Curated annotation (Swiss-Prot):
Located at the top of the head of the 30S subunit, it contacts several helices of the 16S rRNA. In the 70S ribosome it contacts the 23S rRNA (bridge B1a) and protein L5 of the 50S subunit (bridge B1b), connecting the 2 subunits; these bridges are implicated in subunit movement. Contacts the tRNAs in the A and P-sites. This is Small ribosomal subunit protein uS13. Residues 92-118 are annotated as: Disordered. It comes from Yersinia pestis. One of its GO terms (biological process) is translation. The gene is rpsM. Gene3D superfamilies: 1.10.8.50, 30s ribosomal protein s13, domain 2.
Amino acid sequence: MARIAGINIPDQKHTVIALTAIFGIGKTRSQAICVAAGIAEHVKISELSEEQIEKLRDEVAKYVVEGDLRREVTLSIKRLMDLGTYRGLRHRRGLPVRGQRTKTNARTRKGPRKPIKK
């Protein structure tokens, strides 16, 4: 298995699909990385030479991925909560942030129903 950005990339998948195993890299970005590295998208990771894998590592290093991206997202949510914005309050209360209804639905965000104590 090739190791890129601290993640073991699946060997038996095509390059474009395998790169999406890295947090922060979707299909479009992985296609751009393959083009920049000069690697065909349909080639499997196991068929790449060490030199080509090194090119992929260099291209992936240009983006914010994995731990740095997770930290950035967490800090931006924390910043919203510290500022006391509406979005921050919704995050703090564990409610939907983007205007969805909450009278019914929103169970994923709110968690399981809490029984009413009598």
